[in-house]
């Protein structure tokens, strides 16, 4: 709840979407390294991502792919549902072919010019978290550009729930990671 943040004035707290945050980070990075030919966008919640994933992503971009995502095949059956009002049951409307589904991870890699163009074209969406892209590859897809998939890694999971944190602590061999 944003109202629980201690602030002196309402102007002390400025909330932006994930997409807008990445766009600002991209601008800052390119001011610092204006001749960068490859940009990686990584989710800090994926703190255990093995270096080999980064190597695969960068290698694919440098090998000619304009956008690259690491991903794993989806193991569970996935259902598409009809959205229902809160408290009402959802109804299944379809079952996608699991063999074509991938769980996407980060870092996602891009030719710099492609990512800049994707954020420029998608900038209106960035102002509203409900409309903002959930990842940068989606912005590139919206440009009609191809997105290449490389092998992800199970260790690149997001640490977002208490269960995830417990798993991360176990993997790191600590009780307080």
Regions found by a protein language model. Give the residues of each.
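Single conserved hydrophobic/aromatic residue that forms the stacking wall/gate
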Residues: 1-12
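Glycine/small-residue-rich pyrophosphate-binding loop that anchors the diphosphate of NDP-sugar donors
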Residues: 2, 105-107, 156
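Short phosphate-binding loop-to-helix
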Residues: 11-37
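Conserved core of the sugar-phosphate nucleotidyltransferase
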Residues: 48-148, 177
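Short acidic donor-binding/metal-coordinating loop in glycosyltransferase active sites
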Residues: 14, 42-45, 106
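SAM-dependent methyltransferases
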Residues: 135-137, 154-155, 162-177
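Conserved active-site beta-strand element of glycosyltransferases/polysaccharide synthases
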Residues: 147-151, 157-160
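Residue-level signal for inorganic ion chemistry
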Residues: 25, 42-43, 73, 111, ...
């Amino acid at each position: 709840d944003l109202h629980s943040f201690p602030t002196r004035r309402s102007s002390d707290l400025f909330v932006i979407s994930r997409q807008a945050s990445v766009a600002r980070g991209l601008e800052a990075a390119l001011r610092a390294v204006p001749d960068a030919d490859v940009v990686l966008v990584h989710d800090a919640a994926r703190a255990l991502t093995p270096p080999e994933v980064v190597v695969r992503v960068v290698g694919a971009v440098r090998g000619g792919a304009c956008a690259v995502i690491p991903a794993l095949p989806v193991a569970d059956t996935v259902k598409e549902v009809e959205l229902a009002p809160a408290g009402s049951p959802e109804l299944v409307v379809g079952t996608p072919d699991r063999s074509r589904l991938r769980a996407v991870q980060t870092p996602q890699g891009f030719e710099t010019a492609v990512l800049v163009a994707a954020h420029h074209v998608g900038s209106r969406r960035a102002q509203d978290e409900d409309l903002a892209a959930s990842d940068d590859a989606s912005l590139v897809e919206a440009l009609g550009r191809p997105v290449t998939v490389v092998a992800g890694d199970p260790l690149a999971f997001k640490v977002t729930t208490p269960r995830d944190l417990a798993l991360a602590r176990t993997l790191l061999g600590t009780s307080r990671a």
